[in-house]
């Protein structure tokens, strides 16, 4: 950011980042001299009281609607096609050294997407259990299917039994609580909610592209040494991503 200010002589901009760069130092730096920020907030890392309010299904407004009536998202039938693209939000005051607001959104389309991804991972976890091999959890990968597997060594009475593996239903239930929910913190006071969400949404779309490139198209690691071949590899991945996005758009992201 300091280089942007120096090299491009820009002093007024909105800093947008994921939760990994949500330090107090970054927020303070972007709270002066016409700078502002929109930063992803991990719902899992909120204080317990704030988390309960954020994940509560009541108190929502609809983005783009003039209605001030608060909505309980459980009262909406999201199997109805007309409701799938609706987006809801609520604001929660936070105790913070910087004057900011927490904006929590709920998207039924995003909830369905997350549930679909998790169901595939649960299926992979079930297959891992059935192989009867030794299971190694990749602690560095939060999307490792093995996170849904628990080792059972005692029965319900606490008696030691021959160990076996089973799906961790508590873990599955815990993760499903966050389906569809997303949150950002911002020091923008007068900016429209819809505009703030739009800015943050573009960052999420870029991140998803990188994820698809890496996981689906195996962009990395690169097992090549010749520069021309390396460039050809990334060009192939990039063209594949464009085709993927065009097909997804054609199929309405189904």
Spans of model-derived segments:
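Anion-binding and metal-coordination hotspots
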Residues: 1-254
